[in-house]
């Protein structure tokens, strides 16, 4: 009996130690700014500072010259600025539109010369001189919060799509990890989004050609429009599409997985020159899918 009691005591002590260790490990997994939120502005300032300093020494020449519109159009697209499927207050939607217009002024008509690199974050750091950002709802640590300057991913998404349809080489791009609401356009190409966060995540492309390229952005009441222009006409066009779109359930979470494919088309003959898979994208879906969508179990 004494031996049994001793074993039970040892087991209880072991469980207490184990639980304490798990709690400690859980605390270790938390970022310092999660434990002390008041440190977040300092951390953001530090990351932006170090990121900008790092760009001065990374051997890239960043585009910073603007000019009159170049003669030849390489590609174009448009995107609706208001997503009626998001369920978000229309005030925040209008705030996002204002933020997009401010951010676009930092890079509209930027020239990307041969050998230069375009950086989204490098350019938007000067946005304050064009106006004050407004609040937009974003996802931070699993919670939706209002943050000034939010919604700029709408612009980086459009630019990334344009870059994929051009001869420019994407050298940095980060997809969103979570999709919280369906696209307003059911025919929209999936997996081409590009999240940005100054100091952490950027969208960069390099001009490895001998031609000059330029970004042109403009707006109407409903849409944001984008074009890639050049000083020389191109004999080819690039078409982006999806293949192997599927939905899977893993660890009680639903993911969308899709291949992003690019076809190169000869403009003179309208014949396909080549077709290649650029990458595969996987994103967690947190909204309810339509009942007719098949979900694979894994």
Question: Where are the regions that the model predicts?
Answer:
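Well-ordered beta-sheet/strand-loop patches within structured domains
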Residues: 27-298
């Amino acid at each position: 009996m004494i031996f049994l009691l001793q074993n039970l005591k040892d087991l209880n002590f072991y469980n207490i130690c184990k639980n304490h260790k798990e709690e400690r490990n859980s605390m270790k997994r938390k970022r310092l700014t999660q434990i002390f939120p008041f440190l977040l502005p300092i951390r953001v300032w530090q990351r932006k500072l170090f990121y900008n300093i790092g760009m001065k020494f990374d051997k890239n020449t960043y585009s910073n010259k603007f000019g009159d519109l170049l003669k030849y159009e390489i590609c174009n697209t448009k995107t609706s600025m208001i997503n009626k499927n998001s369920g978000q207050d229309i005030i925040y939607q209008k705030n996002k539109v204002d933020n997009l217009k401010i951010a676009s002024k930092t890079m509209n008509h930027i020239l990307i010369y041969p050998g230069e690199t375009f950086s989204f974050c490098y350019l938007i750091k000067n946005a304050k001189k064009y106006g004050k950002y407004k609040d937009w709802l974003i996802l931070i640590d699993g919670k939706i919060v209002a943050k000034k300057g939010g919604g700029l991913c709408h612009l980086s998404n459009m630019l990334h799509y344009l870059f994929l349809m051009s001869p420019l080489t994407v050298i940095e791009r980060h997809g969103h990890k979570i999709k919280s609401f369906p696209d307003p356009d059911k025919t929209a190409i999936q997996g081409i989004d590009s999240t940005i966060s100054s100091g952490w995540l950027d969208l960069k492309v390099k001009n490895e050609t001998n031609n000059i390229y330029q970004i042109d952005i403009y707006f109407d009441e409903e849409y944001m429009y984008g074009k890639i222009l050049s000083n020389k006409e191109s004999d080819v066009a690039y078409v982006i599409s999806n293949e192997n779109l599927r939905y899977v359930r893993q660890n009680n979470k639903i993911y969308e997985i899709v291949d992003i494919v690019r076809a190169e088309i000869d403009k003179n003959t309208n014949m396909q020159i080549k077709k290649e898979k650029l990458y595969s994208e996987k994103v967690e879906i947190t909204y309810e899918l339509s009942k007719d969508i098949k979900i694979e179990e894994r």
